[in-house]
Amino acid sequence: MLIQNTIFYSQEWRWAKFIKFLISQLDNYHCVEHKIASDFSYKESSYGSKKSKKNINLFTWGATHQKRINFARAVCINSPNYSVLNFLIIPKTSYNIPFLGVDFVSLPTSHLLVLDFQPSLKVENQFNSELLEQIIKLKKSCHSSLPVAEKMSEDVAKFFSPGLIWSRLAKHQDSDNLIENQLYDSFKEYLNLYLKTLFESEEVGHGLQQELINGQNDYLNYRRDNDPARPMLSSLFGKDFTESLINKVLFSTNKVL
């Protein structure tokens, strides 16, 4: 099943124009779609009481690039109460480049929004001053309209950069407008800057590459063990499916090369 033939490419899904832009930009850089195992590529389920059952759909999309990207994947969820776009780029460890992390989650009463160049090394060892200035500028522009959410704990904060966009919005029309306009514009700028940085970067030596491998593994292991979406996914799709999805697709260290 192609994602283009699903609800995730229609206006019914909140994040449709985000995933369309994302896929089109990866196409521009000659990324190749990666076939996800059928067990995880599409899943239907239902939740709620017998009298008010609601359907929910999940689609997992992936891509690679021979020289620059080990694995890029998007998990898309649609239902009346939950709408999710979770996206991660795992770059090749031949290049000293952070992850690109996107986590846009609409819950029954709020939206949780995360967008960042997520470091796999200490920030000072992975971001030069020019890149830091650029992402901080994008962050400030976005947060001139979107409120900044609560401070993260130290064990979580180390996996985010100074350019982190992190917001929590109540569900109402004003939030819809912010998502459709300010967040979408920031998302496009972030993605374009990330891909430009990744595809213009130079290869690193063996010693630094080993540090990057270790750093990527640390991040993926932490996310696998502490994924905040685990309870929600388990309640919607079952524990067995959720654990397999998290371990084999979303945060598998087999993707680190």
UniProtKB/Swiss-Prot annotation:
It comes from the Bacteria. InterPro entries: Ferredoxin-dep_bilin_Rdtase, Phycoerythrobilin_Fdx_Rdtase. The keyword Oxidoreductase applies. It catalyses: (3Z)-phycoerythrobilin + oxidized 2[4Fe-4S]-[ferredoxin] = 15,16-dihydrobiliverdin + reduced 2[4Fe-4S]-[ferredoxin] + 2 H(+). Keywords: Oxidoreductase. The keyword Protease does not apply. GO terms for biological process: phytochromobilin biosynthetic process. Its EC number is 1.3.7.3. GO terms for molecular function: cobalt ion binding; phycoerythrobilin:ferredoxin oxidoreductase activity. It is an enzyme of class 1 (oxidoreductase). Catalyzes the two-electron reduction of the C2 and C3(1) diene system of 15,16-dihydrobiliverdin. Belongs to the HY2 family. PANTHER family: PHYTOCHROMOBILIN:FERREDOXIN OXIDOREDUCTASE, CHLOROPLASTIC (PTHR34557:SF1). This is Phycoerythrobilin:ferredoxin oxidoreductase. It comes from Prochlorococcus marinus subsp. pastoris (strain CCMP1986 / NIES-2087 / MED4). The lineage of its organism: Bacteria, Bacillati, Cyanobacteriota, Cyanophyceae, Synechococcales. The gene is pebB.
